[in-house]
Design a protein with these regions (language model features):
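Buried hydrophobic residues that stabilize the cores of well-folded domains
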Residues: 25-268
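Bacterial Sec-dependent N-terminal signal peptides
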Residues: 1-32
Length: 268
């Protein structure tokens, strides 16, 4: 998935790196000053640059498609220390960045709405609901259906947290009409190790890329099982980490049935 897509979609490298970036040392506060610099898979490479306060300045992802390749650039914009929007472009040298997303906040300082843009017009938005601990409880997706003129909500995700601060279950819900009841489409179960997820110390990483368990949980995901509600076979994935001498993850091995993907990371 491309960083330039709406709905907060991100490249496969960034998504896989979301697991790897969650090493047990803070990516932004290490005594060695370590910051994640690059993430590579066999088909993609993402380079992350930072502002002086160690917030993300830019994500540049290069995708290889056979003999072709293309680039996605995501640029966060901050005001008074708050993330207010992100810009997107395929080529900073030849194409000016355009508005990709904007963020609205509630009275408690939580991001409650993420709007997505196409040609400077809102093409969809997410409405976010938090529990009394400030944890994301639900995410409602709004789009304008074909042939209609107003936004409707046909899909949502519900999150269950454990006492350690990890999302242990995500329920994917759908409905045919905006006024119909939601029905369960699939359930995703997560298991974790006991290592600290340093990704949460990278300011706004989840909102810049995507809101999911790996971006929000306190520990590192080691297994993920997707169970369809229609009784179809479940899909299981596992994640294993290798660390360098400074205790940073330098490799993540993702296994899905007989497939294996290796993600390599470099630090600065």
């Amino acid at each position: 998935m491309s960083l330039s897509l709406h709905r907060g979609a991100l490249s496969a490298t960034v998504l896989l790196a979301a697991f790897a970036i969650s090493a047990f040392k803070s990516a932004t506060t290490s005594s060695n000053g370590g910051l994640l610099h690059a993430i590579s898979t066999p088909t993609d490479k993402t380079v992350i640059s930072y502002n002086g306060d160690k917030s993300i300045a830019k994500l540049v992802t290069t995708h290889a498609m056979g003999d072709d390749q293309y680039t996605d650039v995501r640029i966060p914009v901050y005001q008074s220390g708050k993330l207010v929007k992100t810009m997107s472009t395929a080529d900073e040298k030849e194409q000016a960045p355009t508005l990709f997303s904007s963020f609205g906040y509630d009275a408690k300082g939580h991001i409650e709405k993420i709007s997505y843009y196409e040609e400077n017009q809102v093409s969809g938005y997410d409405s976010l609901v938090y529990d009394n601990k400030g944890q994301l409880a639900a995410r409602y997706f709004f789009v304008i259906p074909a042939g209609k003129k107003t936004f409707e909500n046909h899909y949502c995700q519900l999150y269950t947290w454990d006492a350690k601060g990890n999302i242990i279950q995500q329920e994917n819900m759908g409905r045919i009409a905006d006024n119909a009841a939601f029905a369960l489409s699939s359930t995703v179960g997560f298991k974790y190790d006991d290592k600290k997820n340093s990704q949460r110390s990278v300011a706004d990483f989840g909102y810049i890329t995507d809101l999911n368990a790996v971006n929000l949980s306190a520990n590192n995901i080691v297994s993920e099982v997707i169970t369809p509600a229609n009784g179809a076979h479940a899909i299981a994935k596992s994640y294993a980490y290798a660390y360098n001498s400074n205790h940073y993850p330098e490799k993540v091995t993702t296994k899905n049935n007989n497939e294996e993907v290796i993600t390599e990371l470099t630090w600065e």
